[in-house]
A protein has these predicted regions:
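A penicillin-recognizing enzyme superfamily signal
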Residues: 15-218
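Mid-domain, small-residue-enriched loop/turn segments at the edges of structured enzyme/sensor domains
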Residues: 1-23
Length: 218
């Protein structure tokens, strides 16, 4: 209900947060499933009792992505206990795994991925070729008067969105665009996140037909 009902919606007139953008783009990366980002994986009491275990919707096994925008790590954060002991519960560990809902056909996301990969191979995201990877897809974004500059991109494992701008919208300056301001930040992070990781792209689903077209005769 927050999307403006006007013809320029396709050009980006809606206001979205980086988290909302990254959540939406995860559907492209995982082959068409709706996931829910989360931060806390598990909560334990000071006695080691499990009080909470996250159960985000997960992409079915055999499909491209994992649950959430980024998989939880093994690193644990300890919070100093407060007076009073919360009752231990085992219900949190007995949840049935939630299955993510498919919201886009796999053939549609495959074609879209191919188009977004061309942004990096041939378009405004060409700087990302410096990462030396063949599995990256993304898109630059720049609002009127360069008040916002974006770059969103992914491979089959990670989705990252970078926004640059001011709290009170004003121009970032002349010739400041998504490809010149946001993309270098995205490259710095993704270069580290994907270091030594093998390429991971969405497999071609059934029902896709690829043909070569003669550029002269069509």
């Amino acid at each position: 209900q927050d999307l403006p009902p006007n013809l320029s919606l396709a050009l980006g007139t809606a206001n979205l947060t980086p988290m909302e953008i990254a959540t939406g783009w995860s559907t492209f990366a995982n082959g068409g499933y709706k996931i829910s980002p989360y931060i806390i994986d598990k909560i334990e009491s000071r006695n080691g009792d499990t009080l909470f275990v996250a159960n985000p919707p997960s992409v079915p096994k055999g499909d491209t992505a994992t649950s959430g925008i980024a998989a939880p790590t093994d690193e644990a954060f300890t919070i100093n206990p407060t007076p009073g002991e919360a009752p231990a519960t085992t219900a949190a560990t007995e949840q049935a795994p939630a299955v993510a809902e498919r919201i886009v056909d796999a053939r549609t996301t495959y074609i879209l991925n191919s188009m977004l990969q061309d942004v990096i191979k041939l378009g405004t995201g060409r700087r990302a070729l410096a990462l030396g990877r063949t599995d990256l897809a993304g898109k630059t974004g720049t609002t009127n008067e360069s008040k916002d500059a974006w770059f969103s991109g992914y491979n089959g494992d990670y989705v990252t969105t970078v926004w640059t701008g001011f709290d009170q919208p004003e121009s970032l300056g002349r010739r400041e665009f998504g490809g010149t301001v946001a993309l270098p930040i995205w490259m710095s992070y993704m270069g580290a996140a994907l270091k030594d990781k093998p390429p991971h792209t969405q497999p071609e689903p059934e029902g896709i037909l690829s043909l070569r077209v003669d550029p002269i005769s069509g």
